[in-house]
Amino acid sequence: MNHTKLIGIIDSLLDTDAYKLHMQQAIYHQYPHVEAVAEFHCRSKEDLRPYAKAIQAQIQHISTLSFAQEELDYLASLSFFKKDYLTYLKDFSLNSEQVTVDGSGDQLSIKIKGKWIDIILWEVPLLAIICEIRSSICYPHSTADDAIAQLKTKIERFYLNAKTVDSATQTATDLSQFDLIDFGSRRRFSKDVHHKVVDYLAANVPEFKGTSNYHLARTRNLTPFGTQAHEWFQAHQQLTGELADSQQLALNRWLQEYPDSLGIALTDCINTDAFLRDFNSELSERFVGLRHDSGDPITWGEKAIKHYESLDIDLRTKSLIFSDSLTLDKALNIYKHFASRINVSFGIGTQLTCDLPGVETLNVVLKLTQCEGRPVAKISDEPGKIMCRDEDYLTQLRQAFKIAN
């Protein structure tokens, strides 16, 4: 496949992760005039500069898209979207002039600058087009059939491992509480692979419960999943009086927007220890669960359980969502460890939608680097995931949250 044939990779603004719209609605109601900057980073250290022109063409195409009435009607059917926000979406489109693509340096540079509400929906389609352009050039003979064949093998192994009798309990694994969710929009091999993988899972895997992608949820009648991303917490670093108060402000503002829904909190914008210190009794009661996105999942889960137990909260009323570089095998091991104690779900992305024979996956991100003209940062529970353009600010952030350098 030649990249000149790829005009129109993204053909719906709903082809995005659900949490982007959830955050945009909260921004619409609470921070409509806040300015932000987001920047692209390729963790794989692969040279993507040759794709700059093709990426720019796709950006121009995306800027021509708007929400169709049937898409707005679908969003209106979800109880947490409000009428004023949906009215705003009727006239919404992404502005290509806010995106700067530069392939002249030593690596591909992409910067998005504008009002936070205007730029927040760029991330998922932008990363998806980068991955698909690269796939079409580097792996022109790989197809969705290859992805499905690989997926079938993994699913067979998953069920075989689940049936294996555990030496300690002398029983096989009961999968009745195993919830699998597609988190594969951003770094998928291609749109075609993503769609066919989700279709296969929906038809053949009872444990498959839904997708983070609103377009697929709408067109396949699947349950959508998603709450908020790191950028919600990052932005609040510059939307609060005291830096140390930013996490609690972000959590409380989320509850202000969604008091009775979307109650999963992401723990690792700073790190989990710092998060749990801020996650007081009221917040722990009101949020229905936590999401893991970096660091050791077992260690993280045990910390979460210990936190809930210290507050005398019934673990069966809470959920842990695992979403960090998961495979089906990793998810099964985590499930075996926690399922008898607390509700667990598993969001799997790249290992579902970009796992093809001979294909090396691309690890790319687009993260907020400024809010209101000042730096923001993500530290996380994993050193390789730190994202900040200002070392002095990073030091300040660590000090505010009592984190060792």
Swiss-Prot record:
This is Nicotinate phosphoribosyltransferase. The keyword Ligase applies. InterPro entries: N/Namide_PRibTrfase, NAPRTase_N, Nic_PRibTrfase, Nic_PRibTrfase-Fam, Nicotinate_pribotase-like_C. Its EC number is 6.3.4.21. Transiently phosphorylated on a His residue during the reaction cycle. Phosphorylation strongly increases the affinity for substrates and increases the rate of nicotinate D-ribonucleotide production. Dephosphorylation regenerates the low-affinity form of the enzyme, leading to product release. Catalyzes the synthesis of beta-nicotinate D-ribonucleotide from nicotinate and 5-phospho-D-ribose 1-phosphate at the expense of ATP. Keywords: Ligase, Phosphoprotein, Pyridine nucleotide biosynthesis. It comes from Photobacterium profundum (strain SS9). The modification Phosphohistidine is found at H230.
